[in-house]
Amino acid sequence: MSEKAGSQSGGSPEASGVTVSDVQELIRRKEEIEAQIKANYEVLESQKGIGMNEPLVDCEGYPRADVDLYQVRTARHNIVCLQNDHKAVMKQVEDALHQLHARDKEKQARDLAEAHREALSRDQSQGLSPAQAFAKVNSISPGSPASIAGLQVDDEILEFGSVNTQNFQSLQNIGSVVQHSEGKPLNVTVMRRGEKHQLRLVPTRWAGKGLLGCNIIPLQR
């Protein structure tokens, strides 16, 4: 039993690209090993609750006659092997989760960079001058949708959903977009310390006021 478990848990998830299915399979294997460990402990419990360390000889040095020595030795051996297997699988699960998380962060960075390049390319192809900010964030509530999206105080807004420098008239434009986008992601482009940042903001009801949890003021143009 333990040799089979060891062979299935061998190998590193980093040998190839890890998928969510791979992680689910590792977790299934971990649970299977835990069930086997529990079953073997139940065998020991059925033998006078002998456990892993109690002696198998009596006070005179003779093999105990009140327990099944073969079952006890086999269960103890299985538990030791399975615990080693469990430790190995837990390490694989940890490595696989780290790899998935790192890959997700890389993909997010690539997507944002690509969106930035597309925006610049679109402006250049249309012969437009660089986008100008039309509003500014001057306060953000902790834990709000705006905070979760990554907005920061003093961010200057270049695009807010369908609102941009060309069509912005008043803050009512932003309010209208927010009201019609509850629960839906909005693409927001801001200028922060001289650099453009692409954010995804989801207007959502939360513990505070409004759907954003931030205050936006218009910029003088």
Swiss-Prot record:
Keyword Chaperone: yes
Domain of life the protein comes from: Eukaryota
Stretches assigned to the PDZ domain: 108-193
Annotated InterPro entries: Nas2_N, PDZ, PDZ_6, PDZ_sf, PSMD9
Positions of region (Disordered): 1-22, 105-127
Keyword Nucleotide-binding: no
Gene3D superfamilies per record: 2.30.42.10, 6.10.140.1710
Any one Gene Ontology BP term: proteasome regulatory particle assembly
GO cellular component, one term: cytoplasm
Composition bias, Basic and acidic residues: 105-121
Composition bias type Polar residues, residue spans: 1-11
UniProt keywords, alphabetically: Chaperone
Function field: Acts as a chaperone during the assembly of the 26S proteasome, specifically of the base subcomplex of the PA700/19S regulatory complex (RC). During the base subcomplex assembly is part of an intermediate PSMD9:PSMC6:PSMC3 module, also known as modulator trimer complex; PSMD9 is released during the further base assembly process.
UniProt record similarity statement: Belongs to the proteasome subunit p27 family.
Subunit structure as annotated in this protein's UniProt entry: Interacts with PSMC3. Part of a transient complex (modulator) containing PSMD9, PSMC6 and PSMC3 formed during the assembly of the 26S proteasome.
Name the UniProt record assigns to this protein: 26S proteasome non-ATPase regulatory subunit 9
Organism: Bos taurus
